[in-house]
């Protein structure tokens, strides 16, 4: 009995060893080309130094600060919105001429409508433009205020056309400083040091235009698309029930006409 069990015992040991050896050899020989990084015994291969790398994110090429200003052609008068770096837009809060201008956040000024949009008009001097409010039709200007300082406001465009000239000065990030030639000052949105006096608007002041190297974050304005209601491109279908069908009289009915 012992002699008969010995071959069976030896075979039971050798068969798993042989099967394991065959499978291991097959795994080492077969490299799946769809697997990345490439399969090697020592792990993933090191990238070649000649392999081109991905470009690192960063600022693009600097824009010239004295670049040409896009002046609209006479008669075009494109409508735009003027947005500062705080995300609020330059807005007329009152339709009366002479009222101060503020910068309101878009979500808080939806009811203002076209009071937030401005038409760009050619100025009376080279490289200057004028801003005419789309809703009211008065033009933006600056003048000494009643309580001191200089006020940013609007007035009828026919009163001294040269007083409405603004000079857009391009910055390196594609925005503009807006300099009023009537006072020689630039529009500043005081959102970094804002007070709780108005939680929905940013105070606008006219101050000396920053020179090269000075902080100008609050002086930068983006000349963007006008703010208008968005319309759906696809109308939602209106589902209505079918009208009731007429009931035909039953030929076996005893009541009513046949």
From Swiss-Prot:
Q: Could you tell me which residues belong to the region Disordered?
A: 40-71, 236-258
Q: Where is the composition biased (Pro residues)?
A: 46-62
Ranges of Basic and acidic residues composition bias in the record: 249-258
Tagged with keyword Lipoprotein:
yes
Q: Where is the signal peptide?
A: 1-21
- Membrane topology category: Lipid-anchor
The cellular location(s) given in this protein's UniProt record come to:
Cell outer membrane
Q: Mind telling me which residue stretches traverse the membrane in this protein?
A: none
One Gene Ontology cellular component annotation held by this UniProt entry: cell outer membrane
GO molecular function, a single term: toxin activity
Does the record bear Membrane in its keywords? yes
Covalent lipid attachment of type N-palmitoyl cysteine occurs at 22
Name the segments for region: Mediates binding to target cells: 93-104
Quaternary structure (record): Heterotrimer of 3 subunits, CdtA, CdtB and CdtC.
Q: What does this protein do?
A: CDTs are cytotoxins which induce host cell distension, growth arrest in G2/M phase, nucleus swelling, and chromatin fragmentation in HeLa cells. CdtA, along with CdtC, probably forms a heterodimeric subunit required for the delivery of CdtB.
Q: What is this protein called?
A: Cytolethal distending toxin subunit A
Task: Tell me the organism.
Answer: Escherichia coli
């Amino acid at each position: 009995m012992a002699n008969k069990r010995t071959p069976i015992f030896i075979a039971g040991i050798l068969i798993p060893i042989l099967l394991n050896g065959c499978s291991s050899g097959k795994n080492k020989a077969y490299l799946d080309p769809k697997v990345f990084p490439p399969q090697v015994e020592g792990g993933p291969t090191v990238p070649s130094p000649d392999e081109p790398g991905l470009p690192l994110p960063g600022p693009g090429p600097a824009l010239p600060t004295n670049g040409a200003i896009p002046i609209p052609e006479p008669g075009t008068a494109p409508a735009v919105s003027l947005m500062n770096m705080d995300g609020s837009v330059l807005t007329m809060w009152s339709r009366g001429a002479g009222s101060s201008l503020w910068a309101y956040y878009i979500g808080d000024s939806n009811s203002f409508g076209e009071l937030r949009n401005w038409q760009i008009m050619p100025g009376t001097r080279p490289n200057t433009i004028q801003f005419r409010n789309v809703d009211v039709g008065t033009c933006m200007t600056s003048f000494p205020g009643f309580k001191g300082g200089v006020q940013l406001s609007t007035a009828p465009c026919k009163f001294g056309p040269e007083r409405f000239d603004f000079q857009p000065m391009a910055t390196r990030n594609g925005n503009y400083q807006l300099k009023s030639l009537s006072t020689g000052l630039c529009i500043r949105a005081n959102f970094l040091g804002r007070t709780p006096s108005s939680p929905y608007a940013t105070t606008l002041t006219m101050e000396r235009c920053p020179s090269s190297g000075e902080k100008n974050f609050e002086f930068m304005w983006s000349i963007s698309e006008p703010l208008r209601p968005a319309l759906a491109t696809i109308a939602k279908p209106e589902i209505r029930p079918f009208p009731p069908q007429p009931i035909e009289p039953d030929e076996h009915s005893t009541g009513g006409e046949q």
